[in-house]
């Protein structure tokens, strides 16, 4: 009977365990990954990785000119080894669906489609470069080729590449609508209808690569496989490096997962830019990326520059680079016509190479140079569009995060404006700045600890020779009356500071609203009523969300071993209401051995601790500061309203008084104005009379003149008449004389 109970009990446990596992699997397939939602700020760090990777790093080539981007690239390479981050981005890009579910449905997201377009354009560009080099080699060996056209392998490979390029150009011309859709898409657009076209687009680019280079084909065709392999390998290698990358990003899953693919495909063009001009200004959407990268710690924590980028990107609409796409298609037509004229021959018969027009290669090369330039412009437009899509996805991820949190707490879904969401995003950047600072301080303390207490080779060898099963002996506290050594004091102080950093970091990640939580190094002190300042004052509303942590571990263990081996106990508690920040850890000075060195270390640790506490207070008081600002702003508005009313009343009174004065002055001036008007009228009348008299005089004078003229004319007429009469009389006298003479 006892055995039967044991069997039934074990069977029951097996069934329960199987149900739990199947439930977890169903939850994963259905959708939301809590790690993604609770760590939405991880998206920011991919942005910085993608830009530095694209613009300042080329694999196996010249080192980047920007030292910040060089460090960022190294951090990003380590980041990609951790699969949870790349999976998180994959879930977000797929609308919070699991990777397996999205693979089964065969759906692709916008960023992946843009990535395929970039890959295709890059393969197209590589083919153009290879053809240009082939043409140059033919021109250099022109005399030899003229002698042996039929069996020249260089000429034959050139013709093959031209045919491949012609097929590429024809393919682009046939799929113009697909390119335009990709360029004009929005962040919420779905590509289910264009799935087959996208796959053919990607495979078309890789087919052209196979004819050109076998190795490049293998890299490009296995794009997704290589991504998965790179993400799976070395998952446990990035503990501190992951935190140092917690700044800004959204895309390494699409743009930096495959080093062999993206480094060669997206960054080859940028190497030439850096060789020509190291001071190139790159842009994040519309805002220069230097404004995001070249900032100090304080600006990075406030996150204003990056949020300006997000605001500007969210305000944008429509596609990018439409003119570049039109120029690309038009130039492609000309290239296709030139290639068609040159490659009319049948390549199956090598004797046809005799008719190969070598003289037309110069024109083809010039056209290829122009075509390549337009292709580069189009590629940069596509990359800018990809960046905008990623920033929009970041915004979408945060909206989903807020909705999920509201559902968990049983609250209605938030419906607020974009500006309020952007303010919340700033808080996420503050969290990331704190986490980044924590990681930097931890690495600094580790280096300091290793320099002060270097491990000897003999100790390491002795540890290796010991059996793994030998249990560790926990370090016991100092006995009464026994003073600890100086080295152990320094070691314990550094370990305590690192423990507090881990504590604050965990509180920020897991429970951002936790108030009055005492760090583990301070929880065992006598003064248990002390609280941590800078926490949220509204903790009474949800006391069930807050936990106190008690650590039990071996001092010689690392933090991971401490948590995994011994464990962490979480207990609910009522928040403490009174008290201030506890004093920071102080080093105990014992003996006379190198006191200056110990004091210097103590000062460094105290300064670091003060900076941490100040920034932590700035973070936690951010919302309170906003509330105070809003209250002051409202008070100013009320005061301004009161002042405006008073000033309006005073102005009305002054206006009335002025109008009365004006009316009185007008009335006083009225009679004077009448007299002046009458005088002016009299003067005008006198002037008119004088003018009339003058006119009459002139008229009389004119009449007299006319009369005189008439008299003169009459006199002239009379004189003329008299003269005529005299002449007539003379004529009568002359014939009489003549008659008298004749008679004689």
Swiss-Prot record:
<feature type="region of interest" description="Disordered">
    <location>
        <begin position="459"/>
        <end position="487"/>
    </location>
</feature>
<dbReference type="GO" id="GO:0005634">
    <property type="term" value="C:nucleus"/>
</dbReference>
<protein>
    <recommendedName>
        <fullName>Merozoite surface protein 9</fullName>
    </recommendedName>
</protein>
<feature type="region of interest" description="Interaction with MSP1 and host SLC4A1/Band 3">
    <location>
        <begin position="364"/>
        <end position="528"/>
    </location>
</feature>
<feature type="compositionally biased region" description="Polar residues">
    <location>
        <begin position="211"/>
        <end position="224"/>
    </location>
</feature>
<keyword id="KW-0472">Membrane</keyword>
<feature type="region of interest" description="Disordered">
    <location>
        <begin position="512"/>
        <end position="540"/>
    </location>
</feature>
<dbReference type="GO" id="GO:0005886">
    <property type="term" value="C:plasma membrane"/>
</dbReference>
<keyword id="KW-0964">Secreted</keyword>
<comment type="similarity">
    <text>Belongs to the plasmodium ABRA family.</text>
</comment>
<feature type="repeat" description="5">
    <location>
        <begin position="250"/>
        <end position="255"/>
    </location>
</feature>
<keyword id="KW-0175">Coiled coil</keyword>
<feature type="coiled-coil region">
    <location>
        <begin position="644"/>
        <end position="734"/>
    </location>
</feature>
<feature type="repeat" description="3">
    <location>
        <begin position="238"/>
        <end position="243"/>
    </location>
</feature>
<comment type="function">
    <text>During the asexual blood stage, involved in the sialic acid-independent (SAID) merozoite invasion of host erythrocytes by binding to host SLC4A1/Band 3 protein on the surface of the host erythrocyte.</text>
</comment>
<feature type="repeat" description="2">
    <location>
        <begin position="232"/>
        <end position="237"/>
    </location>
</feature>
<keyword id="KW-0732">Signal</keyword>
<keyword id="KW-1003">Cell membrane</keyword>
<feature type="compositionally biased region" description="Low complexity">
    <location>
        <begin position="512"/>
        <end position="521"/>
    </location>
</feature>
<feature type="region of interest" description="8 X 6 AA tandem repeats of [VT]-N-D-[ED]-[ED]-D">
    <location>
        <begin position="226"/>
        <end position="273"/>
    </location>
</feature>
<feature type="region of interest" description="Interaction with MSP1 and host SLC4A1/Band 3">
    <location>
        <begin position="77"/>
        <end position="235"/>
    </location>
</feature>
<feature type="compositionally biased region" description="Acidic residues">
    <location>
        <begin position="720"/>
        <end position="734"/>
    </location>
</feature>
<dbReference type="GO" id="GO:0005576">
    <property type="term" value="C:extracellular region"/>
</dbReference>
<feature type="compositionally biased region" description="Basic and acidic residues">
    <location>
        <begin position="706"/>
        <end position="719"/>
    </location>
</feature>
<feature type="repeat" description="1">
    <location>
        <begin position="226"/>
        <end position="231"/>
    </location>
</feature>
<comment type="subunit">
    <text>Forms a complex composed of MSP1, MSP6, MSP7, MSP9 and MSP3; within the complex, MSP6 and MSP9 mediate the binding to the host erythrocyte. Interacts with MSP1 subunits p19 and p42; the interaction is direct. Interacts with host SLC4A1/Band 3 protein (via the 5ABC region). MSP1 subunits p19 or p42, and MSP9 form a co-ligand complex that interacts with host SLC4A1/Band 3 protein.</text>
</comment>
<feature type="compositionally biased region" description="Acidic residues">
    <location>
        <begin position="226"/>
        <end position="274"/>
    </location>
</feature>
<feature type="repeat" description="6">
    <location>
        <begin position="256"/>
        <end position="261"/>
    </location>
</feature>
<feature type="compositionally biased region" description="Basic and acidic residues">
    <location>
        <begin position="672"/>
        <end position="698"/>
    </location>
</feature>
<feature type="region of interest" description="Disordered">
    <location>
        <begin position="202"/>
        <end position="282"/>
    </location>
</feature>
<feature type="repeat" description="8">
    <location>
        <begin position="268"/>
        <end position="273"/>
    </location>
</feature>
<feature type="region of interest" description="Disordered">
    <location>
        <begin position="666"/>
        <end position="744"/>
    </location>
</feature>
<feature type="signal peptide">
    <location>
        <begin position="1"/>
        <end position="23"/>
    </location>
</feature>
<keyword id="KW-0677">Repeat</keyword>
<feature type="repeat" description="4">
    <location>
        <begin position="244"/>
        <end position="249"/>
    </location>
</feature>
<feature type="repeat" description="7">
    <location>
        <begin position="262"/>
        <end position="267"/>
    </location>
</feature>
<feature type="compositionally biased region" description="Basic and acidic residues">
    <location>
        <begin position="459"/>
        <end position="473"/>
    </location>
</feature>
